[in-house]
């Protein structure tokens, strides 16, 4: 799925190459602004501070890893199972001059050795690949890797509550056969229950269903507009399959049969959590350096260096949409 080629994903993703639900502050917001907002909210929800260590599980093309290191001053260890993503991410890290803060590896997170070494862990829409049989192991690994009182961020798509998560539907059969082999969706109730069972206190749960519907709308429009380029990169059959996959999930989020949540949990420790009692710091008192507004005003020189490094990995430049398409 992820090794179809970086150039293919660049046709419909934002410049940060974030392949997960964005966070829209309005229906008029651009995909670029919404993805930056999402990255920044993750950092705020994890209460990241300079000098802390963040483990980015399923780091993808290193969008969150780079954002957290650049804007919040943390040291990041990112792991992925995709060689294409790793090559892209490492080129981006070099171009941004963040080699001293970010380490990216081709590694299964269960093989990360630094037990109790992380202040925070992020997992953004990787959990869908874990499978029901491995849920217990997943949460126990998160617990093992976190320091006492460390924070775990969990963003994942789920089925609507009250439905049997084990029983496949016609839609999920298509998705798991052709798009995400082995993928399984639990419910938000299962997520919160498992966090409690395996050593966590759930601190915050936020519904992102309508945000993902908007994200998929943007992805569909972008990929369809550049479908001829996609045919050349991945073939017509695969491109059409992706468009069907986007349409199915967009409809699922629109109807509410599929949902997505951001959940923040803390590794249990005796006494107070040490976190603020209200949400002001998440939504109103965010540090100036970590806002999407500031990020969008970054120097063009840095953006040019990043683009050049990315082009060296992908072997080509991103093409503009053809006129009239």
Question: PLM features: what roles do these ranges have?
Answer:
Residues 1-45:
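Conserved Class I S-adenosyl-L-methionine-dependent methyltransferase catalytic core
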Residues 61-72:
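Conserved SAM-binding loop of SAM-dependent methyltransferases across substrates and taxa
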Residues 89-90:
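Conserved SAM-binding loop
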Residues 110-121:
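A short acidic, Gly/Pro-enriched loop at the edge of an enzyme's catalytic core
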Residues 136-148:
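A short glycine-rich, Lys/Arg-flanked "PGG" loop and its adjoining helix->strand segment in the class I
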Residues 149-157:
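Conserved beta-strand signature within the Rossmann-like core of class I S-adenosyl-L-methionine
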Residues 158-273:
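Substrate-binding/catalytic lobe of Class I Rossmann-like enzymes that use SAM or dcSAM, i.e.
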